[in-house]
C-alpha cells in the first residue's frame, strides 16, 4: 500500500476509527450540498428525529436544475421550483449557509467552493455529485457520494469508506499550442480506460501540472472519476496559495502563515511509496475529441475512429455499440463531423480562464449558419468577471448566446437539452447515451477552445488552425 503520500496523510488525520465492518470512519471537513441529492437526505433525518450535526461545515447552492435563461421565480418547471424551495427551507431550518440565485455567489457547486476559498489543502470534502473530485486540485481528498451518504454526513459528519490505493500519474513537459488541460485528462482516460482507476485515488504530478494554473488543475481532477478513480488530487504549491490568498474563507493574517506551513507539511514526501506509477509525455498530447459513448473513447482531432482490431478485446463490444449509436464508422476521420449544438460551460470548463480561451477563438469571427452555440458561466462571480472583461460582448457579437450560471446542458436536468439526433460539441465531462437530454442525442467532448472552433466552422475542427 502507498505510504507518505498526501492521500495517506490526509486520510490518517481524518480517521475517526475502524468500524466493525472493517471500513474506516472518516471525518468530513466540508460538506457541499445542492438541490438534487439533498431533499431526500433531509427527509431521512426528519424521519429519525436527527439534526444536522455541523451546519457550519455545510454549504449549499442551486445549480443542477436552474434554468439559464428565464430565472424568474417561480420557475416554469414546477418540480424545479419545488426542489429549490425544499433546499431553501432545509437550509433555513438547519442554519446552513446557502448561496441562492441573485446572491452574487451562486453557481455550480464545484466552481463556487474554490472561488470562495472554502476548498483548501488537507481537507476531506464530500458532495452528492460525481465530480466532487474537482476539489482535489487544492490538495484535498474529495469524494462524490450518494443520497444515503449525504444523510450520513449531515447526521454524523463522517463517512464509512475503504481506503484507496494511490496511483501517481506523472505528466512532464510543455503542452503544445492548442492543447489544454481538458486534452490532458481525456488523453489519460483514453490511455488507462474508464475502469483503469477503480480502487485508486489519482495523484497528478510532474512538470506539466506544476505549470498549470488552479483552474486547469480543477479540470483534470474533475474528470478523475471518469477514469474510474474515486478521487484525484494535486499537491499544493505556490500556485495553490496564490489562488487562495485573500479569498472570502481563506485564513487571514498570522493564520495564513500557519496554514501555509501546515499545507506544505502534508505534501507527498519525496520518497513516498505509490501502488502504481504511470508517466506521460506532454508533447505527445494533441487536441482531443471523444467519438463514442464513454469519456475513454477519445482520439486526436486529426485521427480517425478506431477499427475494432485496434482496440483491446474487452473494449470492442462497447465500441460496436458506440459506432451504431453515434452513427460513425471505423476509420472515419473525426475532423469534419457536422455539429448542431455547441455548449461551453459545466463544472469541468465553466471558469473564467475557460471562457477567456474560448473568447480568443470567437473574437472577430461568427458562429456558422444553423449552429446553436451558447456559453454558460460557472458562477455569478465568473459571469460578473467575464462581463467586466467584455467577454460577453465578444461571444454575443460572434453569435453565441450568453446565459446565466448553472449546470445547463452538461446533464439536462433543466431546460437546456438536445433535440432528437442532434450532435453537440461540449466542454462538459460525460458523453453517455442521452446525457444531454435527448435519448438519441450525441455528445462529443472537447476543450472550450475546441468547442468554440467547432461553432465557428460548423464541424469538428482543429483549434490550432484558428490560433
Curated annotation (Swiss-Prot):
Disulfide pairs here are: none
Q: Which InterPro entries does this one have? A: 3-IsopropMal_deHydase_lsu, Acnase/IPM_dHydase_lsu_aba_1/3, Acoase/IPM_deHydtase_lsu_aba, Aconitase_4Fe-4S_BS, Aconitase_4Fe-4S_dom, IPM_dehydratase_rel_enz, IPMI_cat
Q: How is the cofactor bound?
A: Binds 1 [4Fe-4S] cluster per subunit.
Compositionally biased region (Polar residues): 422-442
Molecular function (GO) terms for this protein are:
3-isopropylmalate dehydratase activity; 4 iron, 4 sulfur cluster binding; metal ion binding
GO terms of biological process kind: L-leucine biosynthetic process
Q: Give the reactions, separated by semicolons, that this protein catalyses.
A: (2R,3S)-3-isopropylmalate = (2S)-2-isopropylmalate
Query: Which residues of this UniProt protein bind [4Fe-4S] cluster?
Result: 347, 407, 410
**Highest taxon of the lineage:** Bacteria
Q: Write out the function statement from the record.
A: Catalyzes the isomerization between 2-isopropylmalate and 3-isopropylmalate, via the formation of 2-isopropylmaleate.
Which PANTHER family does the annotation name? Answer: 3-ISOPROPYLMALATE DEHYDRATASE, HOMOACONITASE, MITOCHONDRIAL-RELATED
Q: How does it assemble?
A: Heterodimer of LeuC and LeuD.
Question: What family does this belong to?
Answer: Belongs to the aconitase/IPM isomerase family. LeuC type 1 subfamily.
Protein's UniProt name: 3-isopropylmalate dehydratase large subunit
Its source organism is Nostoc punctiforme (strain ATCC 29133 / PCC 73102)
Q: What is the lineage of its organism?
A: Bacteria, Bacillati, Cyanobacteriota, Cyanophyceae, Nostocales
Amino acid at each position: 500500500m502507498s505510504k507518505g503520500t498526501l492521500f495517506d496523510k490526509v486520510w490518517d488525520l481524518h480517521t475517526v476509527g475502524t468500524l466493525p465492518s472493517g471500513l474506516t470512519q472518516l471525518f468530513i471537513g466540508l460538506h457541499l450540498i445542492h438541490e438534487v441529492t439533498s431533499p431526500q437526505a433531509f427527509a431521512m433525518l426528519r424521519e429519525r428525529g436527527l439534526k444536522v450535526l455541523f451546519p457550519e461545515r455545510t454549504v449549499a447552492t442551486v445549480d443542477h436544475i436552474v434554468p439559464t435563461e428565464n430565472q424568474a421565480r417561480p420557475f416554469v418547471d414546477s418540480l424545479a421550483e419545488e426542489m429549490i424551495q425544499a433546499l431553501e427551507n432545509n437550509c433555513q431550518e438547519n442554519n446552513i449557509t446557502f448561496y441562492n440565485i441573485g446572491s452574487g455567489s451562486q453557481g455550480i457547486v464545484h466552481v463556487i467552493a474554490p472561488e470562495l476559498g472554502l476548498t483548501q489543502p488537507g481537507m476531506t470534502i464530500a458532495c452528492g455529485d460525481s465530480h466532487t473530485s474537482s476539489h482535489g486540485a487544492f490538495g484535498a481528498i474529495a469524494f462524490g457520494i450518494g443520497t444515503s451518504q449525504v444523510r450520513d454526513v449531515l447526521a454524523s459528519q463522517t463517512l464509512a469508506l475503504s481506503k484507496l490505493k494511490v496511483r501517481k500519474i506523472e505528466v512532464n513537459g510543455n503542452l503544445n499550442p492548442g492543447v489544454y488541460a481538458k486534452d490532458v485528462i481525456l488523453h489519460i482516460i483514453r490511455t488507462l480506460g474508464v475502469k483503469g482507476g477503480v480502487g485508486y485515488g489519482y495523484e497528478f504530478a510532474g512538470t506539466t501540472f506544476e505549470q498549470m494554473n488552479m483552474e486547469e488543475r480543477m479540470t483534470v481532477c474533475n474528470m478523475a472519476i471518469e477514469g474510474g478513480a474515486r478521487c484525484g488530487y494535486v499537491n499544493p504549491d505556490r500556485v495553490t496559495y496564490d489562488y487562495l490568498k485573500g479569498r472570502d474563507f481563506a485564513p487571514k493574517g498570522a493564520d495564513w502563515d500557519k496554514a501555509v506551513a501546515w499545507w506544505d507539511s502534508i505534501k507527498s514526501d519525496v520518497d513516498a511509496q505509490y501502488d502504481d506509477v504511470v508517466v506521460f509525455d506532454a508533447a505527445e498530447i494533441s487536441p482531443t475529441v471523444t467519438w463514442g459513448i464513454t469519456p475513454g473513447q477519445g482520439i486526436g482531432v486529426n485521427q480517425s475512429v478506431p477499427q475494432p482490431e485496434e482496440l483491446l478485446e474487452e473494449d470492442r463490444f462497447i465500441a460496436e455499440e458506440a459506432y451504431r449509436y453515434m452513427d460513425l464508422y471505423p476509420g472515419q476521420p473525426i475532423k469534419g463531423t457536422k455539429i448542431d449544438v455547441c455548449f461551453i460551460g459545466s463544472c469541468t470548463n465553466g471558469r473564467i480562464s475557460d471562457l477567456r480561451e474560448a473568447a480568443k477563438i470567437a473574437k472577430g469571427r461568427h458562429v456558422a449558419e444553423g449552429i446553436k452555440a451558447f456559453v454558460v458561466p460557472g458562477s455569478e462571480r465568473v459571469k460578473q468577471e467575464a462581463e467586466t472583461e467584455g467577454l460577453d460582448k465578444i461571444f454575443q457579437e460572434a453569435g453565441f448566446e450568453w446565459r446565466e450560471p448553472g449546470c445547463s446542458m452538461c446533464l439536462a436536468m433543466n431546460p437546456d437539452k438536445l433535440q432528437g439526433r442532434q450532435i453537440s460539441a461540449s466542454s462538459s465531462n460525460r458523453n453517455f447515451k442521452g446525457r444531454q437530454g435527448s435519448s438519441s442525442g450525441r455528445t462529443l467532448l472537447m476543450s472550450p477552445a475546441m468547442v468554440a472552433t467547432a461553432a465557428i466552422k460548423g464541424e469538428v475542427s482543429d483549434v490550432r488552425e484558428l490560433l
